Amino acid sequence: MSEELKVVLRRSEQHSGFGFSLLGTTGPPHVIYDIVENSPAADCGAVEAGDVILKVNGTDVHRYTTKEVLKCLRLSEQLVTLELKRDPKLKARIKEQLANTQSPHYVDIESPNIYDYHSSSTNSSPNHRPNAGGKGAATTPSQTGLRYKSPTHLPSLRQNSSPLLASGSTTTTTTATHTHSHSRNSSASSTKIKVVETSITTSTTNVVGLTSPTGSVGGGVGGEATSPTFRPSRIPQALTKCAVPKPVPVLHSPQNKRPRPSQIPTKAANGNGNGHTAHLPPQSLQHSNSYSGSPVTRQRFADREPEREPEPNSAPPQPAKAPRFEAYMMTGDLILNLSRTPQTSNPLPAQAKKIDSLRDSPSRLVNPRINGALAPRASGESSPTSSSSVDSPTNTSSDSVKREAKLLQKQQQQQQQTYQQQQQRDSINNSYNRKDSLTNDTLLMCEELEPDEEGEYVLEEDNKQQRQRQQQQRYRQQQNQQRYEYYQNEDELEEQEEVEEEREEDQTHYDITNIETYQSGVGRGDDDDSDRQCLVDDDDDDDAYDDEENDAGDEDYSTNSLGSGSAKQRLRALKQRTATRQQQRNRDAVDCAGRSGSGSSSTTVKSEAGGLGLDETSFSVPTSPISLSTPLIDKETANSVPTSPEPSSLVPESSSGAGAGAVVVRRHNGHVVRKCDAAGFRTSKSEDHLQQIQREGIAAVIPIDIDEDVNSSLNTLLDTRQDSEDSQSMATVIVNNSSLASNNNEGEQTDNRSSSSSSNSSDNNNCSSNTGEPATSETATATATIITATSTRTMNCSSKLNYILCKKASDRDRIVWTYNAPLQPHQLAALQRQQQQQEQQFQQQQQQLHQQHLQQQQQLQQQHQQQQQQQQQQQQQQLYGQQSHSNSHSSSISSSPQHSAVGSPASPTSVSSSVMSSSGSKGALGLGSSSNGPMAAVQQQQLREREQGGQVAQPPSGIPGLLSCPGGGCGNNGGGGGIGGGGNNDQSVSEAISNISSPDYQDDDNLLSSRDILGGMVLSDPSDSDSTILVSDAAAHQRQQLKQQLRAQQQQQRERERDRDRDREQSEHKVVIQVRGLDSNSSGGNGTNGRSEEDVVTLTDEPLGTMTVGMRDASPPVSDDGSDVESLHSYHYSPKAVDMPSAIRLAKRLHSLDGFKKSDVSRHLSKNNDFSRAVADEYLKHFTFEKKSLDQALREFLQQFSLSGETQERERVLVHFSKRFLDCNPGTFNSQDAVHTLTCAIMLLNTDLHGQNINRKMSCAEFVDNLADLNDGENFPKDVLKSLYQAIKTKPLEWALDEEAGDLQQQRANNSALGNVGLNPFLDPPELATAVEYKKGYVMRKCCYDSSFKKTPFGKRSWKMFYCTLRDLVLYLHKDEHGFRKSQMSDNLHNAIRIHHALATKANDYTKKQHVFRLQTADQAEYLFQTSDSKELQSWVETINYVCAAISAPPLEGGVGSQKRFQRPLLPSKQSKLMLKEQLDSHEVQLAQLDQELNEHKKGPIPSKGLALQNYKEKESYLQYELRRYRTYVSILSAKMLADQQQLELQAQQPSPASHEEEADTFPVGTTACTPPTPQSINQKDQQKEQQQQQPTNRKEKKKK
């Protein structure tokens, strides 16, 4: 039974997170996967694996993805409140599913309520068809799959994609007895496991008990699952290979990161590692999947026999890819998935040991790997060791295994030749498709994420869409196969065309996106180049592909092994077996159409010279940052991880024939080796990871194994440890030629061959002349600097179209690393040679561009017609062409510390301090040479000028196609002065990223512009210590804000003018690496080779102001030794350096009080930050304390400003004073600390001696004793202490006050009576201007009791005459009638009496004088007043009572307490806001309550004696007094209201009522017919009686005389 509970977790010092990880789901429910020992989650004791997170800090997380939940937890405070749901049934189901999947993150769960077990049987068919009516993947009989349905995030169900149950469209392709399972990716979370019980055994094992989700036993296991943010792969697929997606990486806390598989290329054993699991020892199946795609199984070699032995040249069997730890790293708008493989399968260390996990199943325990080895690695990944890796081609698990493998290889070569050829082709294809799969695995394209938020898609569609999609797939297969066969070999072109005509309806796509070419010997022939290039350019164009479907496409076709034999042998075997291959092809249901030709992103040079066998020599896999053109070590002979950068001392060599560039390499014993550079530095593995990406292709993520620390991907940055001699790195510069495929409708193929390691081709941009809407081919390109460009073939686009193209291109950003090391002489020489070659290439390309432009204009109309036809055939599917790579060796230069200028303050690892070179390719500007020939020519000219060291003038903004991005984000030079550079003082895109990440970033305009360019950025949850930025989808938002961006950029130009002046003052220089893209050229329909211009990185040592104007260094300088600690510290964004000029200016203004008050100074000096400390130091420099005693200096200091704030704030200010005093008087005291101690003692002494409420003062001896041993262990001189004591005692310290405050105090002193009306200083003075005067006249006053009913002293009891004035609730007593004049305002105002809630009665008990009334106030004071006669007496009594009854505010309830002593309630002194009738009602209610309370009081027993009796009598007296007072109030208010009513009646009867001059001067008492006088009538009568009152005054004066 499920239950809900609430848990509060607190971060601990040992754990930056909370110690639990979530299941790798893309949406709710968010299930806790495991819990780390000694973590907050473990210490809490209430969290268990399998719990579902419902709320985080009160926020419902059912609408958020797992990444967003982890981000929320990552950014939360120290305390986080989790509301969990614990369902044993759900936990059991998840554990059951995880036990089947062998991987902790392959069960994606969307909703806790929608679980459905289903079992269905389908008949295998060689044709594509929907399974179960499009509701799910077919499963074999008696095989039940757990199906999770999700109501949202089904991006695959778009346009022509047929729906499946939460997994897009799923079809089955079967041959013979094997089932091919193809799963379309979607963001729904579903997992279906299909198992066909077939097996393959080798000599090293007997039986395999488990099959992994990513591999099927004997190729007979097929599985399907989905993942949220994947696009279908565009790679042609081989016959025997099933394309399968893999799930999106899920962020994890640093303690619980997932392992990732190594991707070191290994030899294929039975094609293992690509999608099926060969039988290995049980130890080899512990980690089953690499978390780089969706958990599916793939079948290969449909016609394979069950018991095949591995080939001689095949790699060790690789059952599956291991779970991997994942993190994310900011690379512009791309997400690089940095991953690591766990180092061992042994129990985790104490700090990361899991105490609870959903993976505690027997399947994990019974299948450890051989000798504790790691999970198998994908091709190209680094291995942590050189001897123990099970999938190292040069190291098997044991010597016996090696010998057995060799025997088996010989047997296979003799017995299975046909099968070997088939396997060779498949191995090639498997190695080819790794790049694109990893590209899709780690790239979240902005334009493709947007449809994921559109809500729930229908899970079922009719078979019509399925058949339509299959028809389109077959068409794309035909088109790609035609191109593929054309590029196989020019000599066999006609033969291939004949085969195509015969087999037109049944063609197979071969996955060749990531081909690894080999070279036997030193040289390389044209035939090899042609073969390689034909494979590379096979998937150049796939016009019939929809960009919307890319969101859900198959993701990973990668393999862990390479085919056997050399590339030439494989290609020849591939040509010979064309007919057999055609017969074996089936219609593939997965959208695996090839994309633009960036096929060979790495050039692997293989040499068999030296006579060394593959199993006899082990070399390092280079993971240091190199260029795209850097030759790789033979991956089949690599099993360790070198981390040395390559020097850029190699020059490119041209290649004839096919146009492929020869590679200059250094060989050791016939094999490729790489040495450390001259400086002995090696770069970090995190940077090596980027460079591996650059080699492997477009955004391919190459997970690397880091053996130092699994919790941080940056812990080896700038590691200065030497590598072995066998790991010396070499850099090469190879000409990079970008090609464009011709139109598919023409049936002509453009023989574009790339001579660099990054061969980039761009597809046609289908641009309709009517709408002007471009179908831009875009594919994010990840290199060491992550640069992407959009190359277009649009011929006649409007200005609006060009801007849109520019906008899309600006979505891709660059990251360039800078280091603090000088260039070596050989590097400078190589750089100069490289630049010279570049200039020559520019000139050649300029001529070609001119010729091509003329040809393109002639074919403009024809191409537009063809493009329109393609749009109709493809149903408006946009092309995704891989963009031009920069083939420069920017990584090898920029990531090496010795390649930076001396004194560069930038951190080599901090993105914020790196110089973000924002130079993009022309394609990024929408200025492809085919569509904008003149503009391309302008660009080429500017590039040439930039190479020659000159600044290129910014073109006019009105030129179509030019987009000015902030910071020159789309320009061609680092200063942003190129095309679309945005001005020399603009901020680059990457700097905008760093500023946004910086806590001090507050520039709203810059933030807006950078967000526009990047498509919106959100901080993602880093699973390690790296600071990450996740680029979200905002392509539509970018289009909408295109105009805003242009306007914002103009404003930024003006704002950066100021920054440029300041930056130019700095004397530091930076090495700025510019990454320029390639201008892809269209070859047209004539089949001519389109050779684009090659843009090579330029390394310049120019001042900061000229290269990167407006850049700011947000990281502290890195130490010269390039240590890891410094680099790690500099990586995290630190506050900006103190702006000393600003601090000096502020200190000067504070000292001169320029715009500040004295009370403002302390606030600026007492803050605990660097800037405030700098201001305080500068402020104290304005004081001169030479030859002054400490108390004199302190008095001078405190008179300048008002020292205020808390104790620690005051102490900070005094610290600066102590430092300044000791600087002015060196030697007077032992240290600054001693001065500070004595200063604080003086402050305390001043308070003690001159405090108001301190009875006992400190003596001089005590002052001396208190300071003993505080002068740095010594005593202060006694004479000094005595002099200080006497000085403070004689003259206290004076505190500075603001002038306004001083004036106010003076005014209050002059008018003290206004602030102290009466004896209570806490009561506000009345408003004299608005007060109503009720009565005045001469009276005699006698004080009987002061406040609190205390008797007045005898000296103050005497009768005194005053001129009394009643205004509102205050009775003013003056000497004469002129008391309210300004000259006499303060005269006797202290005698004023507040009469709120007062009572005036006749003093009948006082017999010494006549006409006396008693006034009792609310504070229990009592006065006697004598009037001239009885009428005057009655008038004063009634007037005072009326004012008190009408104006006094209703009382509050009395306090409640446990005291036995009676406490009178406090009565309010404010005036009432009630109307007269409401006031009367209030008094009546209060009267009733008092009467009831008095009755209750009398009913109680009367205490006999003591305090109880006193309290009883006091309370009784109070209640009786209050009853009398309220009865008087009610009586007088009732009479007043009755009189007013009668007066109104009389006025109604008599229009001109008679005057009442004869009516008595008294208020009516009881029910009388007389109208009570108003306050105005009372005043009039008082004036008439003034003459009578003057007579006693005259008599009194005579007596005085």
Curated annotation (Swiss-Prot):
Membrane topology (UniProt): Peripheral membrane protein
Biased composition (Acidic residues): 488-505, 526-557
InterPro entries: PDZ, PDZ_6, PDZ_sf, PH-like_dom_sf, PH_9, PH_dom-spectrin-type, PH_domain, Sec7_C_sf
Position of sequence motif Microtubule elimination domain (MTED): 323-340
PROSITE patterns attached to this UniProt entry: PDZ, PH_DOMAIN, SEC7
Location of region: Disordered: 113-192, 211-322, 339-440, 459-657, 737-780, 872-965, 1040-1126, 1544-1601
Phenotype of the disrupted gene, per the record: Viable but male sterile. Results in enhances preference and sensitivity to ethanol. Fails to develop tolerance to repeated ethanol exposures. Increases axon length and axon branching. RNAi-mediated knockdown increases axon length and axon branching. RNAi-mediated knockdown in a subset of lamina neurons results in axonal swellings and disorganized axonal microtubules.
Ranges of compositional bias, category Low complexity: 166-191, 382-399, 409-424, 468-487, 640-657, 752-780, 872-942, 949-965, 1040-1052
Tissue-level expression: Expressed in the head (at protein level).
GO process terms (BP): axoneme assembly; compound eye morphogenesis; negative regulation of microtubule polymerization; positive regulation of ARF protein signal transduction; response to alcohol
Location, primary (coarse class): other
Keywords of the record: Cell membrane, Cell projection, Cytoplasm, Guanine-nucleotide releasing factor, Membrane
Basic and acidic residues bias (residue ranges): 300-311, 353-362, 1053-1071
Location of region: Mediates regulation of axon branching and microtubule organization: 1-340
Domain SEC7 intervals: 1125-1291
Domain PDZ: residue ranges: 6-88
Region (Mediates association to the membrane and rescricts the microtubule-inhibiting activity to the cell cortex): 894-1601
Boundaries of every PH domain copy: 1332-1445
GO-annotated cellular components: axon; cell body; cell cortex; Golgi membrane; plasma membrane
Subcellular location: Cell projection, Axon; Cytoplasm; Cell membrane; Cytoplasm, Cell cortex
Disulfide bond entries: none
One MF term in the entry's GO annotations: microtubule binding
Known role: Guanine nucleotide exchange factor for Arf6. Regulates axon growth and branching by inhibiting microtubule polymerisation at the cortex. Together with shot, promotes axonal microtubule bundle integrity. Required for normal ethanol-induced tolerance and preference. Probably by activating Arf6, counteracts ethanol-induced sedation.
Complex and partners: Interacts (via MTED motif) with tubulin.
Family: Belongs to the PSD family.
This protein's name: PH and SEC7 domain-containing protein
